[in-house]
Amino acid sequence: MASEGGGTIARWVPAGTMLAVSLISYIDRNTLALLAPTILRETGLSGEQYGFIIAAFSIAYCMANPVWGKILDRAGLRRGMTLAVSCWTVASVAHAFAGGLWSFAAARAALGFGEGATFPGGLRTVVQTLPEDRRGRGLAVAYSGGSLGAVLTPLIVTPIFLWWGWRGAFWFTGFTGLAWLGLWAVVSKRPEVRRVRQVAVSNTPGPRMRDRRVWAYICLYALGALPIGFVLYSASLYLAHPLGRSQAFIGKVLWIPPLGWEMGYLVWGWLTDRGLRKGGSRRESLRRMLTWCAVLSLVFALTPLVPGTVSVLVLMFLAMFAASGFLVLSVAYANSVYTADHAGLIAGVGAGSWSAAVAVMMPILGRLFDVHAYAAAFWIATAIPMCGFVGWLVLSREGELGGKDV
């Protein structure tokens, strides 16, 4: 596999391209989250309605992830990613024409469907182009574009908003998608990217919903990483209303929480590869790291109790750092019990289940924001990852899994 991609640096180009596409996808989806205080004020939408708009994206994203996973596993990366990014680029621009609940929800749902290919494409690329002992870091690179996009969105989009308004910001997101499609037209000519794996010849079963390991994976991914969605979609509203910060100020500081997400991908990816090289029980190594994630995630409950913007941003940073650990380690767990033939579907199930959890919770948390029950919202968002960790401990117990030793 290494020889197909040329030298050491060239080997990482496909993963780097997936970093770029996940970065763009998160700029696209976070533009609404960043500008929510202004958009809600100008359109008259409530926090609960905003939650339903987020849910429209999340439901479509949830349904699309396993679909794109199957498409990418069978039709290949080149065609699958070209179709997906073309779809979401059009949907992103459609936000510029929205003005109410239903138009925003429709544009958001179309965006969610297209972006459902992001993480299946990233994992498919990593397992197809990198050797096994580099896949933890490769996954961190491919997936970290999302967290990097969340970091960069306020820094890039805020000036565009100040110059051309929130509708102009959505036009900009469409142009970024077109730029990536041009890059992909070149990178996807590489033989290891163009290759279509013949999944049908695999002798190992893929993920099935009656398999306890699938539910263990879903618990970690969907519930453990839920604070990422909560912070992404609610941080601007929390800073604007109870803390009284302006849209311009929010744009200057909202990169701080997702920086924890970005750093978490790199740290947890490195720790995962380090644990793999040590050998021993994969499950025990994952259990130790997941315990660290669970303990660290508890500090998020303090957010509504601390004074000042700086303290709030620090706690959000730590929450996203811990949540990224749940995400990386859940994928490492799934890759240890299923073969690379099912990589796209694995990523699709994980990201889809996370999106389903966000779709269920955001209207509820949005309603709590409407009635100023901020403490309850943060405490619920803190408790959910602990439930995911406990669920994984129960469902992944050795001796009940079969297959590989995890």
What are these regions (language model features)?
Residues 2-7, 191-218:
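Juxtamembrane intracellular "pre-TM" segments in multi-pass secondary transporters
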Residues 30, 58-66, 150-151, 258-262, ...:
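Residue-level signature of mid-helix packing/kink "hotspots" within the transmembrane helices
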Residues 32-33, 212-266, 327, 331:
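Extracytoplasmic gate region of multi-pass secondary transporters
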Residues 44, 76, 97-103, 131, ...:
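Helix-breaking motifs and short loop linkers at transmembrane-helix boundaries and internal kinks
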Residues 63-99:
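Conserved MFS/SLC helix-loop-helix module at the cytosolic interface between two early adjacent transmembrane helices
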Residues 107-146:
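Cytoplasmic helix-loop-helix junction between adjacent transmembrane helices
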Residues 142-188:
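Helix-loop-helix hairpin linking two adjacent transmembrane segments in secondary transporters
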Residues 335-371:
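A late C-terminal transmembrane helix in Major Facilitator Superfamily
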